[in-house]
């Protein structure tokens, strides 16, 4: 029987298909950057034509790329569609790139999803990395520090952050008690969202923040729409056709960003109209004053849109990471009650029940600090930094990386590297304590990657660590968290810019004592 009976193509069709394939192959080969003599491109696994490695990445790119790094090394290359992406793993390699060669890797790729955030003017997501961007970053960092971790002369609290967190933590305890008196159980996530958003809102807008706004709470409770789309490897950034096909996730992302930007514009405008220009009480007021100084006597209008963009970045730096960290912490505490008891014993011994915890107590509460660090490491809920890009042709560990190459930083791999941690799958806060168990092992704690490194390091890192500590200290001093017997907690993370655990509606809180 003739072979042609089993082949559904004619010889002409086969010849034409082969010719087209060869042409496409040579075109793509010609598009590859020429590697300077003596260097080489990063190793790359086999990939599908047109699709690249998108199928290999699957629903958990951090796990897939960690597995690839075990075979191909700390510097490897993948393709998402036709776009080359360099993936960095290994703590030393990432430090080399982002710190020692920070100027080479400080860029951001010009991705479609980034253009939808603050109309493409976000300091965190914008591809700009020049002097103007650096000045904006310094301004945002200084404003955030001034009205968060700097001392507050008008308050008995050590700083603005301590004042706001103490207030909202007590309010949170009150809400949880009401829920226990009613349904007798609760989903902690929405309650945490409300508390954290009020803290960052107070620091950004002071008395002008509409903390009871239904729109604000609705936005924050739906922030998962943002983190699910503004993440490393979003197909819409690499396959342009997906922007024009029916795409409900993309439409929700667009709508969320438009709603949030509109809310910020309205709040900033109201703040500008009503605030006392001679009395700066919050971050937005400080930004207004800075812009007035820059405009001088020229009479130029205050660039409110730039202020909105900066406030958007500051708000983001002080909200989602903190909310996610506290939520993960509570899930670990209810699944590991023995750890919760150790923390509460430390709190009872160091602070007692005569006063509330303060930020100045951090050095005397090493086990609580170790628990927070282990939560950061084990959950690795920020699996990748926001993607970087190279600002010029460069080399890393002997591999050539061309200018404007997209770069993924695999923080999850570092936090689960057996060479660093020995038993990375185990949740063990004691790993971060010294041999005597009375202090933190600071060199080891600095090996956790969660906030990035170098010139793009998160401006809210210090704020985040301090806020998580104080919220947990106040909550655990007064409350004991648990779930009823038989309730299973699902700690499997859902991939995103920040990874969330499955929601649990069966958490309970027992009052240990009250200051009332």
UniProtKB/Swiss-Prot annotation:
Keywords: Endoplasmic reticulum, Fatty acid metabolism, Glycoprotein, Heme, Iron, Lipid metabolism, Lyase, Membrane, Metal-binding, Microsome, Monooxygenase, Oxidoreductase, Steroid metabolism, Sterol metabolism. Pathway: Cofactor metabolism; retinol metabolism; Steroid metabolism; cholesterol metabolism; Lipid metabolism; arachidonate metabolism. Heme binds at residue 458. It is found in: Endoplasmic reticulum membrane; Microsome membrane. GO terms for molecular function: estrogen 16-alpha-hydroxylase activity; estrogen 2-hydroxylase activity; heme binding; hydroperoxy icosatetraenoate dehydratase activity; iron ion binding; steroid 17-alpha-monooxygenase activity. GO terms for biological process: arachidonate metabolic process; cholesterol metabolic process; estrogen metabolic process; hormone biosynthetic process; progesterone metabolic process; retinol metabolic process. The keyword Oxidoreductase applies. It is a peripheral membrane protein. Glycans are attached at residue 69. Its EC number is 1.14.14.1, 4.2.1.152. It holds the Pfam family p450. Its cofactor is heme. GO terms for cellular component: endoplasmic reticulum membrane. Belongs to the cytochrome P450 family. PANTHER family: CYTOCHROME P450 1A, STEROID 17-ALPHA-HYDROXYLASE/17,20 LYASE. This is Cytochrome P450 1A2. It comes from Callithrix jacchus. The gene is CYP1A2.
